[in-house]
Amino acid sequence: MEMDKRMKSLAMTAFFGELTTLDIMALIMSIFKRHPNNTIFSVDKDGQFMIDFEYDTYKASQYLDLPLTPISGDECKTHASSIAKQLACVDIIKEDISEYIKTTPRLKRFIKKYRNRSDTRISQDTEKLKIALAKGIDYEYIKDAC
C-alpha cells in the first residue's frame, strides 16, 4: 500500500502542526486497518525523541514532512523515559483504536474531514499547498486558508 494522498493533503493543510507520528499511526489503523511493519526510535532536528512507524513503502513521518533521524542502541538509554512513555501510548492505541479516536478530538475531526470532504476540495487544498510552498508562503497561512 502506498501513502494516501488525501490523508497527506489534510495533514499538511487543515491539520498542519497538530498531528504527531502516533496520531498518523492511529489514523492509518482506523481508516485503512493497517498496522505498522516496524517501529523506529528516532529524534527530530531539535533532538526530541519520536517513534516513527514504517509501512510497506513509507513512514508515518512522511505524512508530516518531518525529517527524523533513527537513533542507535546507545542513544536509547538517553531517551529511555520517552521511549517507555510513547510505547505505552502505542499499546493504548492498539488495544482499542476506536475508543482512542473517540476520545481524541483532533483525530475525530480529521476522520470526519477525511470521510466527508470531497476529492475536489482536497485536490484544491493540495494545489493551494503546492502554489504556496513554491512562493515560500508559511504553512500556518496555508492551514488558515484551507
Curated annotation (Swiss-Prot):
Main location: host cell
Keywords assigned: Host cytoplasm, Host membrane, Late protein, Membrane, Transmembrane, Transmembrane helix
Induction conditions: Expressed in the late phase of the viral replicative cycle.
GO cellular component term of the entry, any: host cell membrane
Pfam families according to UniProt: Pox_H7
Transmembrane spans: 10-32
Location of the protein in the cell: Host membrane; Host cytoplasm
Bilayer topology annotation: Single-pass membrane protein
Transmembrane as UniProt keyword: yes
InterPro entries, sorted: Poxvirus_H7 (IPR006872)
Record family assignment: Belongs to the orthopoxvirus OPG112 family.
Biological role: Contributes to the formation of crescents and immature virions (IV). Interacts with phosphatidylinositol-3-phosphate (PI3P) and phosphatidylinositol-4-phosphate (PI4P) lipids in order to form virion membranes. Mechanistically, mediates proper formation of OPG125-hexamers, and hence the honey comb lattice and spherical immature virus.
Name by which UniProt lists this protein: Late protein OPG112
Species whose genome carries this gene: Variola virus (isolate Human/India/Ind3/1967) (VARV)
